[in-house]
Amino acid sequence: MEQHRVNSEEIKARFGSYHVDVLKQDQTSRLANLYSTHDGVAVCRTLAITRFSQPISPALREADKRIRAGHSIGNTLQQAGLLMSREVIMEATTPCGQQFSALCAQTVLVDSPVYLRVYRLHAGIEPESLNPYAIIAEAHHPAHTAVHAGLRALNDLDASEWESDTKWSVDALQKALA
């Protein structure tokens, strides 16, 4: 498990602003557009599908309420004084779809490769007792996270090896990118 760096801080540091727009949410998941603004135009930097772990650990409940109310996951957990780490499940490339291109204000061309990462986010009070909080599948704008050489295409990976929440998250993200 690697120490989790907060995506919202990375976006703000690199692009000068950070906002989150929850596009869709229910009790088990949410789709969020993490974006920066430029001359009044929103540019998606990360499109994220979150599949929340059930049940939520008591140590995370207050922060979870704020997250479910539309706040940034990493920022909220950090502001609550919680520690985070992420366990990367897979990394790949996938083609940019029409919807992702539109969210990126057409700064990413349709069919160009984008970086995709799926990880399990753990959070808690003590480093040795972090609890699973969610599985998160992210697609990144190339200016935020470039496609690494040697990454395999998502369609070339063996999805039969993934657990059901990972499969669900990847499928939901692919639909949102289309």
Give a label for each model feature:
Residues 1-178:
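Composition-driven recognition of glycine/serine/threonine/acidic- and proline-rich low-complexity segments
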